[in-house]
């Protein structure tokens, strides 16, 4: 399985609650940049899962639109998901060749670290960066890093 891991884009810091934070203008531009990058490079996952938090949904939306896809909201991508929990959800998709996850730090960084075999380590994932891991085995150390690129380099 090819796993495309996208951290939400830059979000405003002021909101009534953390879950209500929306993308800033910079974040909206970052999300559009990621969407165009995916289209230009033929990145077309079978499904796009996004955290229910507004900033993740707003990051996923331009990608889904550019690729002519829908977003599947995944509560298991809300803040606090463990690598094991995420991989358990992905295990049900064994016939899906490529999946995109749109979520949050530190969860995504912990998932990347887990798949790359880092013992209890989290990878620093920048906002609006896209990481591609080929998951050879859905377990610790079972992934191979293909690329990790921030929006500013796309």
What spans do the regions from the language model cover?
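Domain-level recognition of soluble alpha/beta enzyme cores
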Residues: 119-144, 150-154
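Short amphipathic alpha-helix with an adjacent loop that forms part of the alpha/beta core around
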Residues: 85-93
């Amino acid at each position: 399985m090819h796993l495309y891991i996208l951290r939400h884009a830059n979000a405003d810091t002021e909101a009534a609650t953390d879950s209500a934070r929306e993308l800033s203008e910079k974040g909206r531009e970052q999300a559009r940049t990621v969407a165009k990058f995916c289209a230009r490079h033929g990145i077309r996952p079978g499904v796009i899962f996004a955290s229910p938090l507004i900033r993740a949904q707003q990051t996923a939306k331009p990608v889904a639109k550019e690729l002519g896809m829908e977003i599947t909201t995944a509560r298991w991508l809300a803040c606090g998901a463990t690598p094991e929990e995420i991989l358990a959800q992905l295990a049900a998709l064994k016939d899906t060749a490529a999946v995109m996850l749109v979520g949050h730090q530190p969860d995504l960084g912990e998932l990347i670290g887990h798949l790359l075999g880092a013992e209890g380590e989290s990878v620093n994932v920048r906002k609006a960066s896209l990481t591609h891991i080929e998951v050879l085995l859905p377990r610790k150390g079972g992934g191979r890093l293909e690329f990790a690129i921030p929006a500013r380099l796309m």
